[in-house]
A protein has these predicted regions:
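Glycine-rich phosphate-binding loop of actin/hexokinase-like ATP-binding domains
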Residues: 174, 182-200, 261-277, 312, ...
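Glycine-rich phosphate-binding loop plus the immediately following alpha-helix
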Residues: 187-221, 297, 301-317, 376-416, ...
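Glycine-rich phosphate-binding loop and adjoining helix at the ATP-binding site
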Residues: 196-201, 254-312
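Phosphate/ATP-binding catalytic cores across multiple sugar-kinase/actin-like superfamilies
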Residues: 223-231, 313-317, 446-468
Length: 568
């Protein structure tokens, strides 16, 4: 058995500085084996250390400082840190192995990203959905989506609640909502604890394939359990009708314990695409007993790159098309798509005709950059890795990068090729009232991400037949806080879409509620909404066309065309 050592953790942030007594910051005393790295104990105690590299020691984001009992630096640390930093006790949490009792200082509050958004802005004020029969038929079952943002103490009633979960790569957001009114009873949000294995899905796929799959599953289950524990204080047993979880394909596979190897290598095939239903006991291995038993639904995915979060968002925005039994790109009909198809009605056919010109585009400007375009009868989706360019970096959140880049262009400190002018080329530009510098490499990362997004939008538009797009919806936290004019200025969005862009907030979370509500409705009061919901979302999983941009002719040419920072 390995020797146990004690580790005193000193949190170095503004809050702890305000709480200091006699010049000593409050400390947390932890115990761990002397044979393992520091990262697991920090992770177990929710002391989040940012990581882009999946604990390989490449990114240097998990740096900590030993003030007592520093271990000898590893070869990797000698390569990544300066001699002065090593003498001062700085080490990398993912590779250093404390051998004796020690004291460690870690920076608090430095893991900055786009704020978590839980709101949804329905587009009813900008588009008259009632004039489109397809959408009108769906609105009849979605009165509960007239969401109220009230959070009063009197909102606990003797009826049922739905737990909605947005299982993001970066964050986890949960809400408990009244099943009938849609009223928010409680909200829980936290950073995704899997981030210690990397900030992107490819890092987590690699970690899972290297033996960390069960730990990744446990991490997210513990996160969900913390949310449920908070919600338990607001209800009595068996008041929850069900829970619906919407996440990208990798996050959902990791949660369900599926093999994710197929998501990271060609031909990129998910283990399962359709809607999943499991019991709460099965998901948590009978460890959750304080909220009663209820079904847990996992939103279906469309491909390895476009997951349940997008399907849920499309469901919330009434964008899922009605195929009417047509053969899809996958050469299968709606009727044989897992047996969930339904007959096309005369009303559907009439609505499809009225809906031909209502072309809408949904873009989720997050880590995975998912996009979908539809004319009401046909839908095409794709995704492109935006990576950490749209995530936090020190004091600079992703939306600030867009706005600051546009500002530098206007001031002439940055040219259209993305090159910083002197004297900023070597050192970068210091942000006002901050120690953060916006450097040349930050601009290059942003250029690559925005070029990939813009090229993806162009390919979807061309594949749909180059129609006039009536509306672009920006989903997620990044889109919610985005300065749209700055996005036009750098060429992230087409300039001819001015006046047609709408930030719609967290469509994944709202869609998880709407889908969970409709799926549970039949079991609560005998309505048929559940059957229709299953049909709608499974048709999305098996009937929507998906494009792999890496294999698409012309993508590289478009990517290079949109690399420049200019309005177009």
């Amino acid at each position: 058995m390995s020797e146990k050592i004690k580790i005193a953790i000193v949190i170095d942030d503004e809050k702890s500085n305000a709480d200091k007594k006699d010049g000593v910051a409050p400390s947390l005393i932890l115990t761990q084996d002397a044979s393992v790295t520091l990262m697991p104990v920090l992770l177990k105690n929710h002391l989040m250390i940012g990581s882009f590299c999946g604990q390989r020691g490449d990114c240097g984001r998990c740096i900590v400082q030993f003030t007592e009992g520093a271990p000898l630096p590893t070869g990797l640390e000698r390569a990544r840190l300066t001699p002065k930093e090593l003498r001062q006790g700085y080490r990398l949490a993912c590779v250093t192995r404390p051998r004796m009792d020690c004291t460690i200082k870690i920076a608090g509050g430095n893991d900055v990203e786009t704020p978590i958004v839980t709101e949804l802005n329905l587009p009813s004020e900008n588009i008259d959905l009632s004039s489109h029969k397809i959408l009108q038929s769906r609105n009849q079952k979605s009165d509960a989506m007239k969401f109220s943002e009230k959070r009063g103490e009197d909102s606990i009633k003797n009826n049922c609640y739905i737990i909605a979960v947005d299982l993001g790569t970066t964050t986890v957001a949960m809400q408990m909502r009244d099943m009938v009114t849609g009223e928010i009873v409680d909200t829980y949000c936290e950073n995704n604890p899997q981030r210690c294995y990397g900030t992107d899905v490819l890092s987590r796929i690699e970690a899972s394939c290297n033996g960390a799959g069960e730990e990744l599953r446990e991490l997210i289950c513990e996160s969900l359990a913390r949310g449920l524990k908070q919600f338990a204080g607001r209800l009595r047993k068996r008041q929850i009708a069900g829970m619906c979880i919407a996440g990208n394909t990798t996050m959902e596979h990791l949660l369900l314990g599926y093999d994710v190897k197929g998501l990271g290598v060609a031909p990129f095939v998910p283990v399962e695409k359709g809607l999943q239903k499991i019991s709460l006991a099965a998901l948590f291995s009978d460890r959750i007993t304080f909220v009663g038993e209820f079904p847990v639904y996992i939103a279906p995915c469309i491909s390895a790159f476009v997951g349940g979060d997008i399907v849920a968002g499309l469901y919330a925005l009434h964008m899922l098309p009605i195929f009417g039994g047509q053969e899809t790109a996958g050469e299968r009909t709606v009727e044989d798509a897992e047996g969930t198809g339904r007959e096309r009605t005369a009303e559907d056919a009439e609505g499809a005709g009225q809906n031909e010109t209502l072309v809408r585009l949904l873009i989720d400007l997050g880590t995975n950059g998912e996009m979908a375009i539809t004319d009401g009868r046909r839908m095409i989706v794709t995704a492109t890795a935006a990576g950490p360019a749209f995530e936090g970096n020190g004091d600079l959140i992703g939306t600030d990068r867009i706005a600051f880049t546009a500002s530098l262009l206007r001031q002439g400190a940055l040219d259209e090729t993305g090159l910083l002018e002197e004297p900023y080329f070597e050192t970068g530009v210091r942000m006002a009232k901050s120690e953060c510098y916006f450097r040349q490499e930050d601009i290059r990362a942003l250029q690559m991400a925005k070029a990939a997004i813009r090229a993806g939008v162009e390919i979807l538009w061309e594949e749909m037949g180059c129609p006039e797009v009536e509306r672009i919806y920006l989903a997620g936290g990044f889109g919610y806080y985005l300065d749209v004019e700055a996005a036009f200025a750098i060429g992230l969005l087409p300039s001819d879409m001015r006046g047609k862009v709408q930030a719609v907030g967290n469509t994944s979370l709202a869609g998880a509620f709407a889908l969970g509500r409709d799926l549970c409705m039949g079991s609560v009061n005998g309505e048929a909404a559940g059957k229709t919901a299953v049909s709608d979302v499974n048709m999305a999983a098996y009937g929507i066309e998906s494009i792999n941009l890496a294999e698409r002719d012309g993508f590289e040419k478009l990517y290079l065309r949109y690399m420049n920072l200019e309005e177009n």
